[in-house]
Every structure is written in structure tokens, then in C-alpha cells.
């Protein structure tokens, strides 16, 4: 798919292990999982539309005064 083979994936995993350490990996994985879940939820929810009525007459009266 991305042209990343098993060897490249293994090298990346070893580098992440060296940089962050074994104790931080579950924490990083959990944070990444939450981020992906929130992104999917935000992408699937419809956009919120503000339907609050505004009184245009009052605004025009304020401008004339």
C-alpha cells in the first residue's frame, strides 16, 4: 500500500522503542488510538448549524439612532 515492507516496519518499531522506551509505548498507543477514534467521530458527525433566530429589526433601529 505505502511501499513499506516488513524490514522497514521493524526498523521503525525499533527506533520508536529506543526513543520512547518500553514503558511509554502503551501510553503512546492509547493516545494514538484516542486521536484516531476522535477523528473518525468528528468526520462522521454532521456539522452543527446555528439556527438561533436574530431580530433584524432591532439591529436596524440601533443603526438609525
From Swiss-Prot:
Signal peptide: none annotated. InterPro entries: TatA/B/E, TatA/E. It is found in: Cell inner membrane. GO terms for biological process: protein transport by the Tat complex. GO terms for cellular component: TAT protein transport complex. The keyword Cell wall biogenesis/degradation does not apply. One of its GO terms (molecular function) is protein transmembrane transporter activity. It is a single-pass membrane protein. Gene3D superfamilies: 1.20.5.3310. Keywords: Cell inner membrane, Cell membrane, Membrane, Protein transport, Translocation, Transmembrane, Transmembrane helix, Transport. The keyword Membrane applies. The Tat system comprises two distinct complexes: a TatABC complex, containing multiple copies of TatA, TatB and TatC subunits, and a separate TatA complex, containing only TatA subunits. Substrates initially bind to the TatABC complex, which probably triggers association of the separate TatA complex to form the active translocon. Part of the twin-arginine translocation (Tat) system that transports large folded proteins containing a characteristic twin-arginine motif in their signal peptide across membranes. TatA could form the protein-conducting channel of the Tat system. HAMAP family: TatA_E. Belongs to the TatA/E family. This is Sec-independent protein translocase protein TatA. It comes from Nitratidesulfovibrio vulgaris (strain ATCC 29579 / DSM 644 / CCUG 34227 / NCIMB 8303 / VKM B-1760 / Hildenborough).
Amino acid at each position: 500500500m505505502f511501499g513499506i515492507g516488513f524490514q522497514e516496519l521493524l526498523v521503525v518499531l525499533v527506533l520508536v522503542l529506543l526513543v520512547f522506551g518500553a514503558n511509554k509505548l502503551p501510553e503512546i498507543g492509547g493516545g494514538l488510538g484516542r486521536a484516531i477514534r476522535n477523528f473518525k467521530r468528528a468526520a462522521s458527525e454532521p456539522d452543527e448549524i446555528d439556527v438561533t433566530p436574530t431580530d433584524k429589526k432591532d439591529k436596524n433601529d440601533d443603526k438609525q439612532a
